[in-house]
């Protein structure tokens, strides 16, 4: 792509070009000024603004066919990146190219749109319908309002529906895997702000720019970010403290606080520290500012202010807590069963900041699937039981995962890349508990 001539950029110099009027990014050590391409980008303006001022190699290669954008990018080449902010991966191997070609071929040969399936919209309707109906029942259906236990039941349903907002419209939108319309992605993403009170924008930094490119890499994947000391020890290279003993017996109970933690953390990330672990936050657009604060305000209004007009404070807090904890537990347990388990890998860069592993192979080796044969678990986890499939092809609708699984597993077998899968969710979660137990043990050198 382009010539070898041009200016050299350190990652700090690249980072300064991170606005709508001055937008640079790097791919495979080559820097591009895509400011004039911004309005023509098929993936929308927001996508490029998120990647502005950084090396987006793994993200770019996730969402584009190899070589497909070379002719376009050649026009915008301006120089070479000479230092790295985050870990760097080798050129794609034969395994990576083969698995990508085979899956892309599956869709083109059958003339199937990988981003569209009719059942997407039916599931969204069920999620939002059950959320609104369960909320309404808690406040306005006399038969329910007169029975606290029934209100709690509907609060549980509502909490589960809120979790499904995160696992379906939010998650699909953040990977551009539903329709080809960036406006649809923004609207679906905003449902997370309004119904869950948590930021779609922060999620994009954490998930799309952090977790997916750098899965399980300490210091780069925000999903496994920890403090020192931290309440839990999840990474092999993380320092052990005495409070980690028997962590498998108490840490999972803390997962019920996830939603509360995220809502507060959002504000800190966007407006104070301006980074999510190692993922820098770029200037915030007017749209995202309105969605962020509008979402926070709407969440407080519908979850607290409106209920207080009809129910006593104690009951409002009870129902709020029940729904929040159900949502938190479901999301946390689902996430942990995929990556924070005993058999996955925890890659680390070498002294030059290079991960000595093909990116696609790393995605498979840092991920655990489960319950492939269960349509129920596929439905209620947003297809995260096909997590390795999702990590390799995040821009493909989750409803296609079962159809391309055989291609992926066969290719992994052919190239001797171990594919980890458990028969049930409970086996997968047991692996998470065992991982906590082992890392909670006092190290021999202590």
Swiss-Prot record:
Residues annotated as binding heme: 41, 64
Name of the protein described by the UniProt record: Acyl-lipid (8-3)-desaturase
Keyword Flavoprotein: no
Family: Belongs to the fatty acid desaturase type 1 family.
UniProt-annotated location(s): Membrane
GO CC annotation terms, alphabetical: membrane
Gene this chain is encoded by: DES1
Domain writeup: The cytochrome b5 heme-binding domain acts as the direct electron donor to the active site of the desaturase, and does not require an external cytochrome.
Residue window of motif Histidine box-1: 171-175
EC number: 1.14.19.30
Biological process per Gene Ontology, one example term: long-chain fatty acid biosynthetic process
Motif (Histidine box-2): 207-212
Transmembrane segments: 125-145, 150-170
Family matches, as Gene3D superfamilies: Cytochrome b5-like heme/steroid binding domain
Effect the entry attributes to changing residue 88 to I: In strain: ATCC 32221
The protein's enzyme class: oxidoreductase
Highest taxon above the source species: Eukaryota
InterPro entries: Cyt_B5-like_heme/steroid-bd, Cyt_B5-like_heme/steroid_sf, Cyt_B5_heme-BS, FA_desaturase_dom, Fatty_acid_desaturase
Membrane topology term: Multi-pass membrane protein
The reaction(s) this protein catalyses: an (8Z,11Z,14Z)-icosatrienoyl-containing glycerolipid + 2 Fe(II)-[cytochrome b5] + O2 + 2 H(+) = (5Z,8Z,11Z,14Z)-eicosatetraenoyl-containing glycerolipid + 2 Fe(III)-[cytochrome b5] + 2 H2O; an (8Z,11Z,14Z,17Z)-eicosatetraenoyl-containing glycerolipid + 2 Fe(II)-[cytochrome b5] + O2 + 2 H(+) = a (5Z,8Z,11Z,14Z,17Z)-eicosapentaenoyl-containing glycerolipid + 2 Fe(III)-[cytochrome b5] + 2 H2O
Residue ranges of domain Cytochrome b5 heme-binding in the record: 6-82
Main localisation: membrane
């Amino acid at each position: 792509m382009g010539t070898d001539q041009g200016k050299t950029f350190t990652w700090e110099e690249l980072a300064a070009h991170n606005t709508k009027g001055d937008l640079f990014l790097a791919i495979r050590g080559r820097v591009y000024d895509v400011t004039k391409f911004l309005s023509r980008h098929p993936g929308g303006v927001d996508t490029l603004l998120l990647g502005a001022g950084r090396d987006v190699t793994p993200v770019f290669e996730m969402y584009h066919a190899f070589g497909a954008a070379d002719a376009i990018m050649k026009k915008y080449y301006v120089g070479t990146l000479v230092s790295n902010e985050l870990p760097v991966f080798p050129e794609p191997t034969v395994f990576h190219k083969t698995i990508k070609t085979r899956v892309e071929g599956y869709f083109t040969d059958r003339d199937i749109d990988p981003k569209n399936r009719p059942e997407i919209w039916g599931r969204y309707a069920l999620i939002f319908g059950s959320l609104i109906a369960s909320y309404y029942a808690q406040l306005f259906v006399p038969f329910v309002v007169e029975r606290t236990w029934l209100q709690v039941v509907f609060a549980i349903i509502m909490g589960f529906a809120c979790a499904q907002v995160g696992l379906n419209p939010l998650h699909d939108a953040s990977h551009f895997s539903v329709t080809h319309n960036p406006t649809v992605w923004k609207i679906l993403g905003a449902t997370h702000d309004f119904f869950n009170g948590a930021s779609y924008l922060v999620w994009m930094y954490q998930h799309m720019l952090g977790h997916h490119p750098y899965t399980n890499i300490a210091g780069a994947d925000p999903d496994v970010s920890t403090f020192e000391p931290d309440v839990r020890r999840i990474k092999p290279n993380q320092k052990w403290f005495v409070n980690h003993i028997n962590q498998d017996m108490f840490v999972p109970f803390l997962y019920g606080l996830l939603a509360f933690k995220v809502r507060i953390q959002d504000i800190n990330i966007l407006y104070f520290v301006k980074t999510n672990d190692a993922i820098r936050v770029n200037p915030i657009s007017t749209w995202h500012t309105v969605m962020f604060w509008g979402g926070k305000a709407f969440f407080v209004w519908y979850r607290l202010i409106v209920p207080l007009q009809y129910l006593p404070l104690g009951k409002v807090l009870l129902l709020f807590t029940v729904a929040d904890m159900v949502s938190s537990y479901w999301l946390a347990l689902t996430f942990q069963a995929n990556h924070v388990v005993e058999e996955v890998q925890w890659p680390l860069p070498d002294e030059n900041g290079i991960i000595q592993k093909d990116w696609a192979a790393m995605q498979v080796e840092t991920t655990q699937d489960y319950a492939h044969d269960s349509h129920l678990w596929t439905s209620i986890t947003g297809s995260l039981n096909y997590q390795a499939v999702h990590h390799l092809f995040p821009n493909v609708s989750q409803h296609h995962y079962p159809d391309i699984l055989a291609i992926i597993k066969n290719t992994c077998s052919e190239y001797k890349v171990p594919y980890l899968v458990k028969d049930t969710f409970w086996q997968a979660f047991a692996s998470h508990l065992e991982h906590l137990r082992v890392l909670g043990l006092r190290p021999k050198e202590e």
